[in-house]
């Protein structure tokens, strides 16, 4: 029996992983087994950190909003603002509200006053 090496399918799979790991350093970009292991590890880290990033940005937006609202001088907090926004069915999420708070805090002040008057 002659020796049969794996065909084009396995080569294609290894080539795809090698291209994915081409920016890795050392053996992680040269040896097939370590390329596979590091590729899996990189994807796991990317998935975990994308969830973490969403969490951290949401926390940042909430902190910014709360800081701007408390600086207004009204006895008004972030939680009351969000509660009143939902009760009045205003579709402004935390990201947009924090961008408004950073760029133009007077606009946020007008929004909160409008909610209080309703």
From Swiss-Prot:
Keywords of the record: Plastid, Ribonucleoprotein, Ribosomal protein, RNA-binding, rRNA-binding
Keyword rRNA-binding listed: yes
Transmembrane segments: none
Record localization: Plastid
Keyword Cell division appears in the UniProt entry: no
Function text: Binds directly to 23S ribosomal RNA and is necessary for the in vitro assembly process of the 50S ribosomal subunit. It is not involved in the protein synthesizing functions of that subunit.
GO molecular function, one term: rRNA binding
InterPro entries: Ribosomal_bL20, RIBOSOMAL_L20_CS, Ribosomal_protein_bL20_C
Principal location listed in the UniProt entry: plastid
A Pfam family hit: Ribosomal_L20
Protein name: Large ribosomal subunit protein bL20c
UniProt-listed GO biological process terms: translation
Taxonomic path: Eukaryota, Viridiplantae, Streptophyta, Embryophyta, Tracheophyta
GO cellular component, one term: ribonucleoprotein complex
Name of encoding gene: rpl20
């Amino acid at each position: 029996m002659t020796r049969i090496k794996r065909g084009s399918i396995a080569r294609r799979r290894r080539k795809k992983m090698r291209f994915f790991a081409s920016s890795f350093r050392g053996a992680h970009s040269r040896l097939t087994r370590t390329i596979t292991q590091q590729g899996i590890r990189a994807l796991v880290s990317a998935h975990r950190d994308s969830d973490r990033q969403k969490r951290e940005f949401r926390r940042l937006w909430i902190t910014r909003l709360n800081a701007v609202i408390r600086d207004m001088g009204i006895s008004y907090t972030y939680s009351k603002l969000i509660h009143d926004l939902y009760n009045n069915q205003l579709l402004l999420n935390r990201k947009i509200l924090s961008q408004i708070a950073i760029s133009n805090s007077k606009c946020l002040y007008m929004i909160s006053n409008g909610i209080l008057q309703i």
